[in-house]
Amino acid sequence: MQSKLKFLAGLLLLGGAGVASLGAETVPASAQQAPAASRVVLLGTGGGPIARIGRSQPANLLQVGGKTYLIDIGDGMPRQLVRAGVPLNAVDAVFLTHLHFDHTAGVMGFLALDWQARRREPVHFYGPPGTRALVMDTLRALGSGEAIFRPQLPDLPAMASVFFGKDWDVTTPREVYRDGAVTVRAVENSHYGTMHLDPGEHGVNRSYSYRFDMADRVVVFTGDTGPSVAVEQLARGADVLVSEIIDIDAIIAGLKRRQQATGVDQQPLIDHMVQEHLTPENVGRMAAAAGVKTLVLTHFATPPGKEDFDSAAMLAAIRKHFSGRVVFGEDLGAI
């Protein structure tokens, strides 16, 4: 436990309220930690497909047992990974929760830069239907650049021979991945509950939450979701729940201003924000129902142009239901 706390060099305890803010401090992957212990780094903690000053787009790093995994690849992830002390070609597998831009916009940069960093071993992208098409389409888009670099890098394998995508069609909770370091379970969450999306060529669009069971602890990533019994059950007894959170009052106020300015009905988007994201109270309810030990907040969804939020009010709402440890995540914070 003490070795894990060394990663929290930037930790700021707020007034005994049980909230910790992870400092945006670069923590080298080679920091003193037992090889068997797991390490989670929040590479990007911003919410929504919005370019922000203080927070990168959603992405998480998990390292355990000599393996390196990514959960989502928002824009800017390659730089964030290097800032966390991890080379791109150390990545063994990628798990995408869903295919919204803020969770996938870094895929092109990762493929290009990882290949040029002398990627030799295959890396697989796993996720909902459409994941395989995303990887293949991105490789096609990079084809011209690959051809230009090929004379200078004749020893590198074809990009299509080292990057692969695999779709998981998860309709009931199940194990989706296992190796010597982790067992991964997935559930379909409620993020697309009101959207009534037509199936694409790849099938039905879905959004997942993931549970990683490891020798030292259990970590669950909600991805984007609203209240969900399936996610509560997935997270039951977890050591760490990494959860999205939304500043719902600020979001609704911004959407109403947009409607007044444009005349375009924003109610469908308001319904999505209310029902398919997690307010502070709903985060607290989920963490309490699941009986998790530590709640880590990320994917802070605020309106465009507004990056601050009332952390005290958020905490008070969470504390109505959850009495465990609460961490307000920052980019590059390690857990």
Give names to the regions the model predicted.
Residues 3-5, 102, 243:
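Residue-level micro-sites within transmembrane alpha helices that shape
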Residues 17-22, 29:
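Cleavable N-terminal signal peptides
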Residues 1-18:
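Bacterial N-terminal signal peptides that target proteins for export
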Residues 25-220, 309-335:
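Binuclear metal-dependent hydrolase catalytic cores
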Residues 205-209, 215-220, 226-329:
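Cap/insert and terminal regions of metallo-dependent hydrolase folds
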